A protein has these predicted regions:
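Hydrophobic alpha-helical segments at protein termini of multi-pass membrane proteins
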Residues: 2-146
Length: 146
């Protein structure tokens, strides 16, 4: 019986499709439950003011452009530092998908289920970083074996 090759990263196409859906979901949740106040955050306000954006859904292309730059820079660093020659960009994109999925799940739990264990999204940042690093290390180990 032939052993199938294990995929540890998403393809670029699927990663981008999922990221687009997650960004639109995040923006939609902000519009529905917070009336667009997410654009008033310290990070997004200067960007929104620069482009004159008042609706979070209209910020989607800017966020996706930012993700594109992060994916390219992260893939370049993975190739240079970690010596991952294949699937470096897919690794970064999959990490973004996992981290953003956890963030969106937290948003859904806060808005729909009144989840208050983590009262502020800033407290979630270290947790998301740990999740991203843990997946990155695991996937990198698997990719180097392949």
């Amino acid at each position: 019986m032939k052993k199938e090759k294990q995929r540890v990263v998403l393809s670029r196409l699927w990663a981008w499709i999922i990221l687009v859906l997650l960004v639109v979901l995040d923006a939609s949740l902000d519009v529905i439950f917070e009336q667009g106040r997410g654009l008033e955050s310290n990070i997004l306000k200067p960007i929104a003011d620069l482009f004159g954006i008042t609706n979070p859904i209209l910020m989607t292309p800017v966020v996706l452009l930012l993700f594109y730059l992060v994916a390219k820079a992260g893939a370049w660093m993975a190739k240079k530092i970690d010596k991952i020659s294949e699937q470096a960009e897919e690794l970064v994109l999959t990490t973004l998908v996992i981290v953003y999925s956890v963030f969106d799940l937290w948003l859904i739990s806060v808005y729909l289920l009144d989840f208050t264990l983590i009262p502020n999204h800033l407290y979630l940042i270290p947790i998301l970083i740990v999740i991203g690093i843990a997946y990155g290390w695991w996937a990198e180990k698997k990719l180097i074996k392949i």
